[in-house]
Amino acid sequence: MSTGDFTTADERLREVMETPRRAYLPLPDTQVIERPGWLQLVTPSLRQGGLNEVAFSALDEREADAVIDETIELYRRLGLRFRWTVGPDSRPADLAERLARRGLLPFETHGMIRGTEAIPIEAGGDVTVEEVGERTVEEFSRTLAEGWGMDPGPIEAFNRLVIASPAGRHRLFLARYRSAPAGTASLVAFERSVYFLGGVVLPAFRGRGLYRALVAARLRYAAERGIPYATIHARASTSAPILERLGFETLCRFPIFTNG
């Protein structure tokens, strides 16, 4: 799909890698740690993941080991699951190796982009997708938590904050199969792109077109509002191959590390 309106390849890559760093919506207990070459989130109330991450790290080689150790120890002491993104602009060059030596586990990720023009849907009437509001946020949160193996309580509290946010940049989507809740996804809207995240389909409903339908619904949301591009950080082993078949272009590959 065309993404030719961007002037340079660097501009496209920045939209994929830098813009999503501002996708977070902080909870009252979220600590945002930001300085030149560093962006980190710490949220003690979300122990199983979410708003606990190093989103950007460009470290001086001489201080890298100390910063890595301090960061890992912070999350360990608080008992938090976290992630560390090692994108193309991360430093030092061997940052991924340093994290791996400390026992963090990587998964390969594709930074992808697509225009928001529509894709054909073949799921039929059995599959529906709806935007989530106050009436369905509990059902959405329960489905998301089941899909990701998380406690639904903190997730629901966060999602209620999302739908109540006056900025309205974050949107939640619930997919159903024959009326049963079966999958979830979300997006964050920026000026030139929407950032896709949180897509999951429950195992019992996979292979029925629900993931495609969630992608299509979010593309339609963006297109109707004149937002020309969609971006995503997709797992190489799961969603990236599907998204490539749906017209997303991979601009870069990079690891994201987790502590379990």
For each feature predicted by the language model, list its residue ranges.
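A conserved beta-turn-beta hairpin within the catalytic core of GNAT-like acetyltransferases
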Residues: 46-53, 107, 189-197, 206
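Short amphipathic alpha-helix that is part of the acyltransferase structural core
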Residues: 1-20, 55-56, 61, 110-111, ...
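Conserved beta-hairpin
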Residues: 31-36, 88, 94-105, 170-183
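C-terminal appended segment following the main domain
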Residues: 216-260
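N-terminal charged segments
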Residues: 1-76, 91, 154, 164
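A conserved beta-strand-loop-helix scaffold within acyl/acetyltransferase catalytic domains
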Residues: 152-204, 252
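Conserved acetyl-CoA-binding loop-helix of GNAT-fold acetyltransferases
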Residues: 64-72, 201, 207-220, 224, ...
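Acyl-donor-binding surface of acyltransferase catalytic domains
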Residues: 62-138, 232, 239, 255-259
